[in-house]
Amino acid sequence: MPKPIKRLSSHKKKRVIFKGIIQIKASFNNTIVTVTNSQGQVITWSSAGACGFKGTKRSTPFAAQIATENAIRTLISQGMKQAEVMISGPGPGRDTALRTIRKSGLVLHFVRDVTPLPHNGCRPPKRRRV
């Protein structure tokens, strides 16, 4: 039986990106960080669940920090220098994720809050009784 051939490098294309958009979705249960180029094509993404946090630990600010560091590490290796940040959601990880991006050394053009707010749209779910 022949031995399997070891792959020397990954099949993933090496891209050089100078400017991109970092989108942070901070929900009450998880924090998802997606990085796109200016056309909207996804370059990399990371989330608290994908970084190994399970259950209620996903909703912590520390999990959001690790997920953001994971995404930014990939960006810097691909040569990104400038970024725009769009934050949506009311979760506990939104401030920590933004702090982590500021410490990373990327030049931020703007930080925008794009949390969707209803103008009295759908009826909300009933209140929880615990």
Curated annotation (Swiss-Prot):
Gene Ontology CC terms, in alphabetical order: chloroplast; ribonucleoprotein complex; ribosome
Keyword Hydrolase: no
Subcellular location: Plastid, Chloroplast
PROSITE patterns for the chain: RIBOSOMAL_S11
One GO BP: translation
Alphabetized GO MF terms: rRNA binding; structural constituent of ribosome
Principal location listed in the UniProt entry: plastid
Keywords: Chloroplast, Plastid, Ribonucleoprotein, Ribosomal protein, RNA-binding, rRNA-binding
Entry-linked Pfam families: Ribosomal_S11
Subunit structure: Part of the 30S ribosomal subunit.
PANTHER family: 40S RIBOSOMAL PROTEIN S14/30S RIBOSOMAL PROTEIN S11
Family assignment from sequence similarity: Belongs to the universal ribosomal protein uS11 family.
Name the UniProt record assigns to this protein: Small ribosomal subunit protein uS11c
Organism, scientific name: Psilotum nudum (Whisk fern)
Lineage, highest ranks first: Eukaryota, Viridiplantae, Streptophyta, Embryophyta, Tracheophyta
